[in-house]
Structures are given as C-alpha cells and as structure tokens.
Amino acid sequence: MSRIQFENVSKHYAGKTVVAVDNLNLGIEAGEFLTLLGPSGSGKTTSLMMLAGFERPSAGTIRFDGVPIETLPAHRRNMGVVFQSHALFPHLTVAENVAFPLKVRRLSRSETATRVTSALEKVRLAPFAERMPHQLSGGQQQRVALARALVFEPRLVLLDEPLSALDKKLREEMQLEIRRLHRELGVTMAFVTHDQSEAMVMSDRVAVFNHGRIEQIGPPQQLYDAPCNTFVAGFLGDNNKVEGKSGPDPVAPAGQMEIRLANGLTLRGRRAGHSTNGPSQVLCVRPECLKVALDAGQLETGNQIGARLVDIIQQGDHWRLVAALSDEDGGLRAENWTVKVNVGSVPAGLTVGQPVVLRFRPEDAWIF
C-alpha cells in the first residue's frame, strides 16, 4: 500500500467554473521523492495544500498509511512543510525557529536542544544557531526552513516551490542539498515546482499536471524520452513540432508511422501510445536530436526538412540554432525549430539567413 493515496479527489471553489483538481488518483510510495510539476493553475499546489490540511477536498478521500485524513486538522497530520517564502519568525534566532515545532509538541528542553542541534547539523548550519534570519542569505534561510520541517521527524515532508525565489546558483545548490537529505534520511517527500529542470534533477517520479488532472506520471527520464502527448513533450524539456496528415506507410517499421506536411514533405516517427485516430497528427522531436547541414548531401539518409537559419545563439557549452521551416505555399503549421549543437560541431560557414537542411532519425521523433 502507498504511504499517501488520493482516491477520486476533487477541489472546486465557490463562484468559479474551473475545477482546481479534477478526480485525482495518485499514490506516493514510502521513501520516494515525488514531484508535482505543471504550469500555474494546473492543480499541483492545491493538491499539496489538501495533503497538508490547508485545503479540504470537495470530494474524494486522502489516505495516510491507509487512514483517511481529509478531515484531520493540519497540526495533527505530523507532516513537515517548507514554503517558498521560508515563513521564518524574524524575532527568533535560527535555533528558536527550528525549535518551534518541538515547543508546540511540549518536548523537554534537553530533548529540544538535542534535536535542534541534530537538525542544524543535517543542513550544515550548526554554527549559525544564534543568528537572526535577516543575517542569513536566501539559501541559508531556506536551509533553516528545511531543518524546522525535519526536526520533529515527520513521516512526510511537503515542499511548495521552495527554491523559486533563489538565484540560479543558489537554486542548483539547494537542489543537491535536498537530494542529499532525502537520500540520507529516507523520508518521503512531495515537491511542487513549475521548473522542469528541477523536476528532472531531483525526482524519483514526476507527475505532470494540467487543468487539474495528471497527464502522465513516471520516472523523469521516461517522461522525457516517451511523453504521452504534446503537452508533456512540450512542458518537460524543449521540443520542436509540426502538424501534418496521417497516411498509409506500408514500408514503415513496426511502431512507426508517416505524416505528410502541408508543403508535401513526408516525415516518419514513432507512433505514440496516445496517438490520435483522426487525420491530423503532430510530429515532435527534441532539439538535441537534430543535425544541421548546408545541403542534403552532407547528411545521412532519414527525415530531412529544409529550413532558413533565423538566429545563432551561444549558450556556454553549446550553440542554439533557430530555424524557420521552408514553407513556400504558406500552409505549414509550425513555429521556428531550435537545434542544439555542441561547441565545435557547428558547420563551417553557417550564417543567419542561410538555407539549411535539418535531419533526424525516425526513432528520435514521436507522432501524436
């Protein structure tokens, strides 16, 4: 049995026509790190707040180790919660902030002191015990919030976009810090974010939310390599897509299909498990799966599509090429494509405005 189980859980607010969470069924296993990923308004934070006890479901059941908890007050759920805002008491020292949950639980002074020291050591802030919150950096303040969430040894820790206010360097440091704590303590963690790179780095599993429902759930690499639809493909990582019409392809290998674009070009890719049955299809391919050349003769056989180079952007360890697909008749429905090329692999003589050929293997593309 899962540690946490959402069973047909829904949440709607009075006066609003949009359902915040729509018939959610989700299990969180003991000891796992599950990320709820999605855009603003997708239902991920509302789901976490219902689990924490700050919101009550409109329908359905939430179980913690088999026991229904949807009517249980938040302070009786024994869950640690870390918020984006840190929510530290400005008039208390670091140690006093961490000790607060223990004072509420009426632990002895000696037990409180022992646990506070241990929690601060876990987050590597023991030397800062007597400092005030305003004397700490943003990353240090978030470590204090983590220590406070862990000090009473909860069975579950909930993290609501705790790193979104930090700069890139601090955010990456805290990602590794939280991963380390999860690995060392083995505590179950549920993490909310809209940052797909955060989800990829930190999670055992990712649940991708959209319009109050889970589109897909699984290990991050599985979702990246085999998205179930165009939303997941576009939200979890960069993605190029183009629309076309499906058609018979008697020579396509098993599991592949062919689409014909508005400009008459045919492309082949893997048939997605949730591929639509209608005539209109969407082909998706990742930027790192594309190769670029000045003419078709420089590329291996496979899917090839003409384009015009719009921009060349250097991004540290790689180049990002932006290309507009060739569309003489104006009927092609596609945004500009991007190509990720390692430094040193950009074809010589490549300039903005130049016609190029893009190539990708059928097994690297999905057709939905």
Region spans (language model):
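Conserved structural motif at the start of ABC-family nucleotide-binding domains
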Residues: 4, 19-21
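Conserved ABC transporter NBD signature motif
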Residues: 60-68
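Non-catalytic connector elements of ABC transporters
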Residues: 239, 249-368
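ABC ATPase nucleotide-binding domains
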Residues: 74-80, 84-234
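The feature captures the beta-strand-to-loop junction immediately N-terminal to the Walker
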Residues: 37-39
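Helix-to-loop junction immediately C-terminal to a conserved catalytic motif
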Residues: 52
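ABC ATPase nucleotide-binding domain helices that frame the ATP-binding cleft
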Residues: 45-48, 144
